[in-house]
Swiss-Prot record:
It comes from the Eukaryota. GO terms for cellular component: chloroplast; large ribosomal subunit. InterPro entries: Ribosomal_bL32, Ribosomal_bL32_plant/cyanobact, Ribosomal_zn-bd. GO terms for biological process: translation. This is Large ribosomal subunit protein bL32c. Keywords: Chloroplast, Plastid, Ribonucleoprotein, Ribosomal protein. It is found in: Plastid, Chloroplast.
Amino acid sequence: MAVPKKRTSISKKRIRKNIWKSKGRRAALKAFSLAKSLSTGNSKSFWGDKSNKY
């Protein structure tokens, strides 16, 4: 069974965790931005009837 030779440092662990968190934040911000543009009718990435509001 493969075993790591040395322990991962706390700073490296923190950096990796922050990268993982920032990816989630970016995805959430993008989703929120898209929802905002859909609700105002300014979306350029969706085709279809613009008068149909949910």
